[in-house]
């Protein structure tokens, strides 16, 4: 047997029985870049459906591209926004705050550290993480684009 039952899979190669999604949205369009596959897999499991990995499948995934500075900023903003949104959606506002708190404190400390030592690129990365968290906290949609 070349299938393995799992709770979640990465989204770069997924196949679905779309008939099972007639009664609900497929991907949550509020997500952008991160955790949309985790959200979908969690909803599938909550419906007592199965997720399988084909263990001998071969996928040619051309990854590992270098990111421009602006894409790096976008990525960091959306990672933090999506992490908060995912936790809020599935576990509630206070659990989301608890789960993002250390990320927020870490980003603040690193932001000020890189500000003091004049590392502007690194400072901007942590600024974008802070902004992503704040936007999620105040209920703004995942709006940041380049």
Task: Write out the residue ranges for each language-model feature.
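Hydrophobic side chains within alpha-helical segments
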Residues: 31, 39-42, 81, 85-86, ...
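A short, conserved alpha-helix in the catalytic core of glycosyltransferases
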Residues: 2-26, 30-58
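Flexible, glycine- and charge-enriched loops at secondary-structure boundaries
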Residues: 31-34, 69-76, 123
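Non-catalytic, C-terminal membrane-associated alpha-helical segments of glycosyltransferases
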Residues: 74-82, 93-146
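Short, glycine/charged-enriched secondary-structure capping and boundary segments
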Residues: 47, 67-68
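Extended, non-globular alpha-helical segments
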Residues: 2-17, 69-104
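Residue-level signal for well-ordered alpha-helical scaffold segments within enzymatic catalytic domains
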Residues: 19, 23, 43, 85, ...
């Amino acid at each position: 047997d070349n299938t393995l039952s799992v709770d979640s899979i990465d989204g770069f190669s997924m196949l679905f029985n779309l008939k099972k999604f007639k009664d609900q949205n497929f991907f949550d369009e509020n997500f952008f870049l991160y955790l949309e596959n985790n959200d979908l897999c969690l909803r599938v499991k909550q419906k007592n459906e199965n997720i399988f990995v084909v263990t001998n499948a071969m996928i040619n995934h051309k990854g590992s591209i270098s990111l421009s500075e602006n894409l790096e900023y976008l990525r960091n903003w959306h990672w933090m926004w999506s992490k908060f949104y995912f936790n809020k959606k599935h576990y509630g506002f206070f659990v989301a705050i608890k789960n993002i708190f250390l990320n927020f404190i870490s980003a603040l400390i690193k932001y000020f550290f890189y500000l003091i030592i004049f590392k502007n690129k690194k400072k901007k990365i942590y600024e974008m993480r802070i902004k992503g968290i704040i936007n999620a906290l105040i209920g703004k949609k995942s709006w940041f684009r380049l």
